[in-house]
Design a protein with these regions (language model features):
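Catalytic alpha/beta core domains of metabolic enzymes, predominantly
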Residues: 97-222
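Catalytic beta/alpha-barrel core
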Residues: 17-18, 34-45, 62-64, 69, ...
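Conserved N-terminal beta1-alpha1 strand-loop-helix module at the mouth
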Residues: 1-76
Length: 222
C-alpha cells in the first residue's frame, strides 16, 4: 500500500465526543468548542444530515465495533459511515474492521477524508510487541493516525503505552490513551508526550477512566 498522506492536525487536538441526543444539542452552542467533534454513529443511529449543519467544528465519524466498546445497531455500520463520510474530516475504522469496512476505507481515501485506524482493549494492556505489530498493520493499510486505547490499572501498563507513543512518533501520527485507573492521567500526560488527539465526552463518559470535556478543559491549558 502507498504511504499515508499527512493530514493537517493541531499539535494535540481536543476531540469532543458526541454519543447522545443531549450532547448533540449541546455542541452547537459551545462558546469554546473542541478542535473536532467525534460523532458516535453507533449511539446515534437516527442522526439526520440536517443536524450536522449546526456543528461548526470538523467531524470525526465513528461506528464502533461492539467488541471494542461500540453499541449494537440495526443499521449496517458500513451504511452509516458511508452516509456521513462526505461531511467528515476523519473516519475511524478499527483494525479488526478493515476488511468488513473496506469500502468505507477506500471511499475515504477517494474523498480525501483522513483515516484513523484504531485498536481498543478495555480489559488489559497488551505486550509492547503486540501493540507494535498492530501499528505496523495500520501503517501498511495507509492510516493517517493510529489510535490505541487500552486498560491501564498499574504503572507498568501506563509505561507500556508511553513507550509505544514515544518510540513510534517518528513513524506515524499516534493517538494514545488509557481507560481504567490511569485513564485520567494518561489524557493529561500523553497530550504533552505527543499524542495527536485526546478525546473527551461532552457530558457522559462511555468507559471508566474518561474525563469529560469540562473536566479536561479545567486542567492546565487545554
Amino acid at each position: 500500500m502507498s504511504a499515508p498522506r499527512r493530514i493537517k492536525i493541531p499539535t494535540c487536538a481536543l476531540v469532543g465526543v458526541i454519543a447522545s441526543v443531549d450532547e448533540l444539542r449541546l455542541a452547537p452552542g459551545m462558546r469554546a468548542p473542541p478542535d473536532l467533534f467525534e460523532l458516535r454513529l453507533d449511539h446515534l443511529p437516527n442522526l439526520r444530515e440536517s443536524q450536522l449543519l449546526k456543528l461548526r467544528q470538523p467531524l470525526i465519524i465513528t461506528a464502533r465495533h461492539p467488541a471494542e466498546g461500540g453499541k449494537k445497531v440495526r443499521s449496517a455500520r458500513r451504511d452509516l459511515l458511508l452516509k456521513f463520510l462526505p461531511r467528515a474530516k476523519f473516519v475511524d475504522v478499527e483494525l479488526r474492521s478493515l476488511r468488513e469496512l473496506g469500502p468505507v476505507w477506500d471511499e475515504a481515501r477517494r474523498l480525501h477524508v483522513g483515516r484513523i485506524c484504531s485498536f481498543h482493549d478495555f480489559k488489559r494492556t497488551p505486550e509492547p510487541a503486540v501493540l507494535h505489530k498492530k501499528l505496523l498493520r495500520a501503517r501498511k493499510a495507509g492510516a493517517d493516525v493510529f489510535k490505541v486505547v487500552t486498560r491501564a490499572e498499574d504503572f507498568h501498563d501506563l509505561l507500556t503505552l508511553f513507550e509505544l507513543l514515544w518510540s513510534e512518533l517518528a513513524s506515524m501520527r499516534l493517538c494514545v490513551m488509557a481507560s481504567g485507573k490511569f485513564g485520567p492521567i494518561s489524557r493529561l500526560f500523553f497530550r504533552d508526550a505527543g499524542s495527536s488527539l485526546i478525546y473527551a465526552p461532552l457530558r457522559h463518559p462511555l468507559h471508566h477512566g474518561q474525563l469529560t470535556f469540562q473536566e479536561l478543559r479545567g486542567q492546565r491549558d487545554f
